[in-house]
Amino acid sequence: MQAACWYVLLLLQPTVYLVTCANLTNGGKSELLKSGNSKSTLKHIWTESSKDLSISRLLSQTFRGKENGTDLDLRYDTPEPYSEQDLWDWLRNSTDLQEPRPRAKRRPIVKTGKFKKMFGWGDFHSNIKTVKLNLLITGKIVDHGNGTFSVYFRHNSTGQGNVSVSLVPPTKIVEFDLAQQTVIDAKDSKSFNCRIEYEKVDKATKNTLCNYDPSKTCYQEQTQSHVSWLCSKPFKVICIYISFYSTDYKLVQKVCPDYNYHSDTPYFPSG
């Protein structure tokens, strides 16, 4: 005697029946166990006398290669067909159960800071090192969010020389002329509205060993300066102009920051 267990899940409205086990004997008789209480209005799904359809052909190939194998002769009655309305009701109920939960709406990102740093101290710096000079200039730009912005500079130098840091329009020509470095053309005055807000310079002198000859003593001047400009919008763009003069070194440099990275409206240089 061999026993095989078959698990079939049948959805019959409104009760679910689980056919748990079928004990098969050599005589071909089957004993079926059902869980749940059957109703008189429902037909038995598995019977021995039904001749409608056999699935033994589908399962016989699995047991032919085994000794003392027994062909299975499981039969079932054709179930009662559902009406079209019943199918639509079943699909509607299953869809309602599988509907995903609505996603929570994300809150927009709100900027809480009043000030927006456009350029930090590390975004702009100029470092000059010579035998007689060690110069470092750093700057930053801060947008106040009220139509104005400030430009800050700090400068540290050890040695002798003159350093000038100023704001100029992009049309400023780079040249070795101290008299021309702070001149603003009349056509640029409307788009360039800046004034000095704060300025402080600290100087100290000392005698130290010379870099080029440690056996000698050199006179060194240490200078620390802080300056800030307050500018009003609208403006096109401002540039930073640095000029340095000493006995052995000259430098003139103009740097125009990239405002397209921070501005919603792109800047198109002209002139």
Swiss-Prot record:
Keyword flag Membrane: no
Q: Where found?
A: Secreted
- Report residue spans for region: V (Cys-rich): 186-271
Task: Specify the domain of life of the species encoding this protein.
Answer: Eukaryota
Post-translational modification (record)? May be proteolytically processed at the boundary between the N-terminal non-conserved and the central conserved domain in neuron-like cells.
Q: What does this protein do?
A: May be signaling molecules that resemble neuropeptides. Ligand for alpha-neurexins.
Looking up Pfam families in the UniProt record yields:
Neurexophilin
Q: Which UniProt keywords apply?
A: Glycoprotein, Secreted, Signal
Q: How is this protein named in the record?
A: Neurexophilin-1
Write out the ranges of the annotated region (II).
Answer: 22-97
Matching InterPro entries, A to Z?
Answer: Nxph (IPR010450), NXPH/NXPE (IPR026845)
Signal sequence extent: 1-21
Which Gene Ontology molecular function entries are recorded, alphabetically?
A: signaling receptor binding
Residues of this chain annotated as glycosylated in UniProt: 23, 68, 93, 146, 156, 162
A GO CC annotation given for this chain: synaptic cleft
- For this chain's UniProt record, which GO biological process terms are given? modulation of chemical synaptic transmission
Annotated spans, IV (linker domain):
177-185
